Amino acid sequence: MSFVPGQENAGSRSSSGNRAGNGILKKTTWADQTERGQNNGNRGRRNQPKQTATTQPNTGSVVPHYSWFSGITQFQKGKEFQFAGGQGVPIANGIPPSEQKGYWYRHNRRSFKTPDGQQKQLLPRWYFYYLGTGPHAGASFGDSIEGVFWVANSQADTNTSADIVERDPSSHEAIPTRFAPGTVLPQGFYVEGSGRSAPASRSGSRSQSRGPNNRARSSSNQRQPASTVKPDMAEEIAALVLAKLGKDAGQPKQVTKQSAKEVRQKILNKPRQKRTPNKQCPVQQCFGKRGPNQNFGGPEMLKLGTSDPQFPILAELAPTPGAFFFGSKLELVKKNSGGVDEPTKDVYELQYSGAVRFDSTLPGFETIMKVLNENLNAYQNQAGGADVVSPKPQRKRGTKQTAQKEELDSISVAKPKSAVQRNVSRELTPEDRSLLAQILDDGVVPDGLDDSNV
């Protein structure tokens, strides 16, 4: 019994036009229509015989035979089509492992002319054929053939042909190519999808079945390729990839002083209860200094605000708007308006008090308690009372010189002695005594006179 890919029972096939045995309209793939596209406008003429591998023109515009599966298209030049051993056979319902053997056939596609007049060759597309079918039906498994890559399941017997029927595109559509888990697709290739032309296929078939009066209308609904590949698809894919990489892999946006100022001003323009402090607009700029009435926040959290890594777990304790209004004690208080020169306006405060209750079963309880203990009344542990974040100390001019002067003044330096003091130890000579006697009124110089009494 011959096997039919995609069907459990091979005997259920039908050849009734474009409908399968179950009466469902079947669509065809791009490979099917490429071969028949040349005869679309030749109604009433005798159909041309199907071209085979030996009669295929070098232009590559015709796909010989009909593969059971959608193709694999190359989109990067210089890549080699290959599968690892035991891989590469498309899977389909109804095909036992013993029949999973065959080859991938390279179809050289047509060339096209670019807007500047140059000829450009489309990269090839590969189609799978079971062993004993397709353009190389008479070849043995493993024969060295240009443009053929052999694949087989580890349980398949490659010495015999696969018992698989040829595909009739009028009865069976091409199956989307799928591989067994773990199969590595060749680099630089992608699997052609199928089914994208199903609406056009059905509308085209319906319009053709309405009679000759609708043939002109049906010409605009001709079935389109199931997988339309633009000539420059490889370039487009590369451009998209580069654009994506350029977006994601670019340098991080730098925050300048100007941008930080704009962010801060944008936050401060909001009502007080709508502000969200962050690095650009710290807590004290949003809500003021810490003190008895605003007693939460340590130095690190006051700098980072909600950007602090510990803040998200605290946010789990924050009440919802519903809990705020319905679970708190609210009081509306009218406040005095501005100064005398300011326009008169009514100012109110919605004062509230409440509590958030939690216990040790709360996820992250220990971390929450640690963060709360570090930030509650943290201003009391800082020098300067309510000023938790101490301002940057200003450098006073002349401080260094003043300190040096004070240091010099604190050092006691002995003053040099006079000439008389330096001679205290010298004995008086008789000449000195005579001279002193003349000076003194009484003319007597005591014997005990020394330089210390002079």
Curated annotation (Swiss-Prot):
It comes from the Viruses. Residues 260-383 form the CoV N CTD domain. Residues 1-62, 186-230, 271-290, 383-428 are annotated as: Disordered. It holds the Pfam family CoV_nucleocap. Residues 49-61, 215-227 have a biased composition (Polar residues). Homooligomer. Both monomeric and oligomeric forms interact with RNA. Interacts with protein M. Interacts with NSP3; this interaction serves to tether the genome to the newly translated replicase-transcriptase complex at a very early stage of infection. This is Nucleoprotein.
